[in-house]
From Swiss-Prot:
The keyword Ribosomal protein applies. The gene is rplN. It comes from Ehrlichia chaffeensis (strain ATCC CRL-10679 / Arkansas). This is Large ribosomal subunit protein uL14. Binds to 23S rRNA. Forms part of two intersubunit bridges in the 70S ribosome. InterPro entries: Ribosomal_uL14, Ribosomal_uL14_bac-type, Ribosomal_uL14_CS, Ribosomal_uL14_sf. The keyword Transcription regulation does not apply. CDD domains: Ribosomal_uL14. One of its GO terms (cellular component) is cytosolic large ribosomal subunit. Transmembrane segments: none annotated. Part of the 50S ribosomal subunit. Forms a cluster with proteins L3 and L19. In the 70S ribosome, L14 and L19 interact and together make contacts with the 16S rRNA in bridges B5 and B8.
Length: 119
């Protein structure tokens, strides 16, 4: 579960490496896979598309907390990770690193198509 002031990894090549969650757009106190959050970049790579300290929207693609599926299986990852998106929901980067959990159907199909592995 992700809440305010959570430090997250970035799973794309937009130029950011670490971001800080500064707001949740689902109206709850915590967010999980597939939710959109507001983040501020904290650690960046040189010559990236993003700047340090700027505010972006991001979709959560991996969480450490175990998530139970309808068939009873459980999925959990070793890190909390997001993909930075623009206002239309398209990713800022052109690649997504690592496996991601299946996102809500139709909302982030571009993010899922860029991923190497979708669980």
């Amino acid at each position: 579960m992700i809440q305010k002031n959570t430090l997250l990894d970035v799973a794309d090549n937009s130029g950011a490496r670490k971001v800080l969650c500064i707001g949740l757009l689902n109206g709850k106190k915590s967010a999980s896979v597939g939710d959109v959050i507001v983040v501020s970049t904290k650690l960046i790579t040189p010559r990236g598309k993003v700047s340090k300290g700027k505010v972006y929207k991001a979709v959560i693609v991996r969480v450490k907390k175990a998530v139970r599926r309808l068939d009873g299986s459980v999925i959990k990852f070793s890190s909390n990770a997001v993909v930075l998106i623009n206002d239309q929901g398209d990713p800022l980067g052109t690649r997504v690193f690592g496996p991601i959990k299946k996102l809500p159907f139709g909302l982030f199909s571009k993010v899922m198509s860029l991923a190497v592995e979708v669980l």
